[in-house]
Regions:
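Solvent-exposed loop/turn segments at secondary-structure junctions
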Residues: 41-44, 74-77, 95-99, 133-136, ...
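Early extracytoplasmic/lumenal segment of secretory-pathway proteins
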Residues: 27-104, 114-115, 221
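Alpha-to-beta junction loops
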Residues: 84-90, 148-150, 211-220
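Short, low-complexity disordered leader/linker segments with a strong preference
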Residues: 1-33
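Extracellular/periplasmic juxtamembrane helices and adjacent flexible linkers that interface
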Residues: 258-338
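Stable alpha-helical elements in mature extracytoplasmic
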Residues: 41-45, 49, 77, 86, ...
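A conserved helix-loop-strand patch within extracytoplasmic ligand-binding domains
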Residues: 102-175
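Ligand-binding pocket segment of bilobal, Venus flytrap-like solute-binding proteins
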Residues: 177-242
Length: 338
């Protein structure tokens, strides 16, 4: 892990007293506060996790910690942080959105190596949420391009989940058409012609489908779909497509902010603790796939662990995928506006 000795010493001097004989760190203030800027679908996860972390931090340091949450479409959230929304940590939908904050000079190089599993403490995938009984008999991506099917998915220009949705559909079409890009684009175009509304974030899309009754199928984060079924077991069911994508949400400390506020210790521990057994089970209980493979196996009755998943590496990594598909004038714009 990259060390930042000068900034770390400055931060520690502001908030702690070091016991010269015992080597024990004593936290002078009674309380500390941090802000976690996250994406749309993590509200329930962090509501539960924050309570666990508050107990952990209190036991470890004697300090109370107040945690403020901010949620929205991942791309939009990254832009907000880059433009001045003060976040001690970010827990966003994908690596590229954290890179955008790094490019703004707020996060140091090498952030992806700061925490285990490429700073992805949990993963997810993309599934379909349909109405109970599956009246349109939706089984796979092919069914989403039928003319009588209304699709709900967020806008990939603002939502991280929407970008995962798009790439999962692209992977299916690539397999179906043996890499013929013209046919792939036609397939994606037909899918988006069926989209009734492009909400800015995944939670907004869920609201459109679940609460407003729009559409026949919601392309959704796996955890978001499971939460809907949990809340409305008589109204919805999940369909797992034949091909999907390994979605890897990313976490990072916002270095410039924590060094200014003197919150590096608590911010780093906040993200480190996501890898603890307790936090990994909190992730699983909220329908995220734990990065700890042993704990993931505890949820084999919940998740389809044999699902065929492509990865972002199949698209050349996030930088290439963003530039090719989601940049202004990229393939998504060409398809959607064409």
């Amino acid at each position: 892990m990259k060390r930042r000795w000068k900034s770390a010493v400055a931060a520690l001097a502001a908030i702690v007293t070091i016991g010269s004989l015992t080597g024990v760190t004593t936290y002078a203030a009674d309380s500390v506060s941090i802000t976690n800027v996250s994406y749309d679908s993590t509200r329930e996860l962090y509501e539960q996790y924050n309570k666990s972390f508050q107990e952990h931090w209190k036991e470890k340091t004697g300090q109370d910690v107040e945690i403020t949450q901010s949620h929205g479409g991942s791309g939009k959230q990254a832009l907000e942080v880059a433009n001045g929304l003060e976040a001690d940590v970010v827990t966003l939908a994908l690596e590229y959105d954290v890179d955008a904050i790094q490019d703004a000079g707020l996060i140091d190089d090498g952030w992806v190596d700061e925490f285990p599993e490429d700073s992805a403490p949990y993963t997810s995938t993309i599934v379909f949420l349909v109405r109970k009984g599956n009246p349109k008999n939706i089984k796979d991506w092919d069914d989403l391009v039928k003319k009588d099917v209304g699709v709900i998915t967020p806008n990939p220009k603002t939502s991280g989940g929407a970008r995962w949705n798009y790439l999962a559909a692209w992977a299916y079409a690539k397999d179906k058409y043996n890499g013929d890009e013209d046919k792939i684009k036609e397939f994606i175009g037909d899918l988006y012609k069926n989209v009734l509304v492009l909400d800015t974030g995944a939670r907004g899309a869920t609201t459109s489908f679940v609460e407003n009754g729009q559409g026949d199928v919601l392309i959704a984060w796996e955890n978001e779909a499971y939460l809907s079924v949990k809340d409305y077991p008589d109204d919805y069911e999940i369909v797992t497509p034949s091909i999907s994508i390994l979605a890897q949400p990313s976490v990072a400390v916002v270095d410039k902010v924590v060094d200014k506020r003197g919150t590096r210790d608590v911010a780093e521990e906040y993200l480190n603790y996501l890898y603890s057994d307790e936090a990994q089970r909190i992730a699983g209980d909220n329908y995220y796939r734990p990065s700890n493979q042993d704990i993931l196996k505890e949820y084999s009755d919940v998740f389809d662990l044999d699902i065929n998943l492509v990865t972002i590496d199949d698209f050349g990594g996030w930088k290439k995928a963003q530039e090719t598909h989601f940049s202004d004038g990229g393939i998504f714009d060409q398809i959607y506006e064409g």
